[in-house]
Regions:
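Membrane-interfacial helix-loop-helix
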Residues: 1-30, 56-149, 174-189, 196-212
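Short, amphipathic, aromatic/basic-enriched membrane-interface segments that mark the entry/exit
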Residues: 18-19, 39-43, 123, 151-156
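Transmembrane alpha-helix interface/packing and boundary motifs in multi-pass membrane proteins
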Residues: 30-52, 193
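Hydrophobic alpha-helical transmembrane bundles that constitute the permease/transmembrane domains
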Residues: 131-135, 155, 159-162
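Membrane-embedded alpha-helical modules
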Residues: 146-149, 153, 160, 165
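Transmembrane alpha-helical segments of integral membrane proteins
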Residues: 162-175
C-alpha cells in the first residue's frame, strides 16, 4: 500500500524529500532510476511518473536544475541498463531454465519475443514500457547481444526516456489544470505505459487459443 501511495502521490513525496534532504534529492532520484533499470528484480519502481514529477518540481520549486537533473538521471539510466545487461550475460540463460519467485519468467519470455520481432530497437522502445525496460537489457545480455550495439541503443533510449518525461513535466507540470489533477495524471501515465504490454499479452493469449 505504501508503494501505491508513493506512486500516486509521487509529487508530494518528492517535495518532502526536497524539504528534508535538499541537494541530496539528486542522489535519491539517481539511485531510484539506477535500481529500477539495473536490477531485474525491481521492475515495479515508478520510473515514468517519477521523471514527470521531478521535472514539474524542478520548474515549480527551483530546488533542482533541470539540466543537472536530466544529465544525472541519464547517467543513472545508462549505468543501470549496462549493469542489467552484464547480469543477464552472466546468469541469464540459467534464469530461463529455473523457477524463481524473484523474477517473473513470463515477463522475460514476453520481452524475448519482443526482441525477436524488433531486434535492438527493443532497448529503445522498452524504456517507455514498465517491466519491459527492466527486463530488456537483461534479455539482451542473456542473448549475447554485441555490447557495442547494445550501448548505442542504450544511450539513445536513455536520452529519449529521461529527456521526454523531464521536459514534459517541466513544461506542463505546473499548468493549473494539470497541477490540480496530478494524481489522475500520474494514474493516466501508468495506464498508458502498461497498455502496450496488456495488448501484447492479450494478443498472444488469443493467438495461442486460436492455434489450439
Amino acid at each position: 500500500m505504501e508503494l501505491i501511495d508513493f506512486i500516486l502521490h509521487v509529487d508530494d513525496h518528492l517535495l518532502e524529500f526536497i524539504t528534508n534532504y535538499g541537494v541530496w534529492i539528486y542522489a535519491i532520484l539517481f539511485l531510484i532510476i539506477f535500481v529500477e533499470t539495473g536490477l531485474v528484480v525491481m521492475p515495479f519502481l515508478p520510473g515514468d511518473s517519477l521523471l514527470f514529477a521531478a521535472g514539474a518540481l524542478a520548474a515549480s520549486t527551483g530546488a533542482m536544475n533541470p539540466w543537472t537533473l536530466g544529465a544525472l538521471l541519464f547517467i543513472a539510466a545508462v549505468l543501470g541498463d549496462t549493469l542489467n545487461y552484464h547480469i543477464g550475460r552472466y546468469i541469464g540463460p540459467r534464469v530461463f531454465e529455473i523457477e524463481s519467485r524473484f523474477i517473473n519468467k513470463q515477463h522475460l519470455i514476453n520481452t524475448q519475443k519482443f526482441f525477436e520481432k524488433h531486434g535492438g530497437k527493443t532497448i529503445i522502445f522498452a524504456r517507455f514500457i514498465p517491466f519491459a525496460r527492466t527486463f530488456a537489457p537483461f534479455v539482451a545480455g542473456a542473448g549475447k547481444m554485441d555490447y557495442k550495439f547494445f550501448l548505442s541503443y542504450n544511450l539513445i533510449g536513455a536520452f529519449c526516456w529521461i529527456g521526454s518525461f523531464i521536459t514534459l513535466g517541466y513544461i506542463f507540470g505546473n499548468v493549473p489544470v494539470v497541477k490540480d489533477n496530478f494524481t489522475h495524471l500520474i494514474f493516466g501515465i501508468i495506464i498508458i505505459s502498461i497498455l502496450p504490454g496488456i495488448i501484447g499479452f492479450t494478443r498472444a493469449k488469443l493467438k495461442k487459443k486460436i492455434n489450439h
